[in-house]
Amino acid sequence: MSRSIKKGPFADASLLKKVDAQADADKKQVIKTWSRRSTIFPSFVGLTIAVYDGRKHVPVYITEDMVGHKLGEFVPTRTFHGHKSTEDKTTAK
């Protein structure tokens, strides 16, 4: 289910504060955040935000196509190593 329209999009207050400070600064730096639940706003476009995946912060460059999505959508939390192939299986006889 999606969020109610009357509530509007959510973004962490601390993240918005960091983004506003970054917009005023001349030098672009990576913004570190733990807020995977925050919605990407148009003011985030062009910034690099390091999103926490449970182990480390993964840098994500924000583009126009990402607006409206959540930050956590672009950083997977689980590492997929692939399914075991049939050649690797040993047959016990």
UniProtKB/Swiss-Prot annotation:
A GO cellular component annotation in the UniProt record: cytoplasm
Key word Disulfide bond present: no
Annotated coiled-coil segments of the chain: none
InterPro entries associated with the record: Ribosomal_uS19, Ribosomal_uS19_bac-type, Ribosomal_uS19_CS, Ribosomal_uS19_SF
Keywords from the named record: Ribonucleoprotein, Ribosomal protein, RNA-binding, rRNA-binding
Keyword Lipid metabolism: no
Domain of life, per lineage: Bacteria
Signal sequence range: none
Alphabetized Gene3D superfamilies for the sequence: 30s Ribosomal Protein S19, Chain A (3.30.860.10)
One of the record's GO molecular function terms: structural constituent of ribosome
PANTHER family referenced in this protein's UniProt entry, alphabetically: RIBOSOMAL PROTEIN S19P FAMILY MEMBER, SMALL RIBOSOMAL SUBUNIT PROTEIN US19M
Similarity section: Belongs to the universal ribosomal protein uS19 family.
Free-text function comment from the UniProt entry: Protein S19 forms a complex with S13 that binds strongly to the 16S ribosomal RNA.
Protein name per the record: Small ribosomal subunit protein uS19
Organism per entry: Lactobacillus helveticus (strain DPC 4571)
Lineage: Bacteria, Bacillati, Bacillota, Bacilli, Lactobacillales
Gene that encodes it: rpsS
